């Protein structure tokens, strides 16, 4: 495999990737975009979509990572960030969630779909209470 600065060429098409339920949240399905493999785990990217009829638990949590960006492609989602309040993200909205920020997903539309990019690809999540 050819590598450029530790990265391999990678392309993912919507009609060849499968959504899987095995992810961080049971009310979402995840489709990996191959970025984790192409970067040896330095970055991760996946499409996340809502499982219709399932709702968020609204639990406060934070992630131990260096970068996390969310871009909504369809539907809407309401996040609450500690010290930043509630924010409605709609199709076209983008949020950078700084490392360690406490947040929770309060509710979402059944047609929610978003792209999440993280560094690194694998990271730990801590369940936390709000302060």
Task: Locate predicted features.
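Double-stranded beta-helix
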Residues: 2-13, 104-131
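A short glycine-rich, His/Asp/Glu-containing loop-to-beta-strand
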Residues: 18-61, 66
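Flexible, glycine-rich phosphate/dinucleotide-binding loops
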Residues: 39, 78, 123-124
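Hydrophobic/aromatic beta-strand elements that line small-molecule binding cavities or substrate pockets
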Residues: 46-49, 93, 103
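Short, conserved beta-strand element in jelly-roll/cupin
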Residues: 47-50, 62-79, 117-120
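A generic "binding-loop/recognition-motif" signal
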Residues: 65, 85, 101-102, 110-111
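A generic structural motif
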Residues: 80-82, 106
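Short acidic-glycine-tyrosine-enriched beta hairpin
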Residues: 83-100
């Amino acid at each position: 495999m050819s590598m450029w600065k530790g990265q391999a060429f990678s392309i993912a098409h919507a009609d060849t990737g499968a959504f899987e339920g095995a992810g961080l949240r049971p009310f979402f399905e995840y489709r990996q975009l191959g970025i984790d493999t192409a970067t040896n785990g330095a970055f991760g990217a996946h499409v996340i979509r809502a499982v219709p009829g399932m709702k968020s638990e609204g639990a406060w949590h934070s992630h131990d990572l260096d970068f996390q960006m969310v871009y909504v492609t369809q539907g809407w989602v309401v996040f609450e960030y500690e010290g930043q309040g509630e924010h409605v993200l709609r199709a076209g909205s983008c949020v950078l969630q700084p490392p360690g920020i406490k947040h929770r997903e309060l509710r979402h539309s059944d047609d929610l779909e978003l792209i999440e990019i993280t560094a690194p690809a694998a990271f730990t999540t801590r369940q936390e209470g709000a302060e």
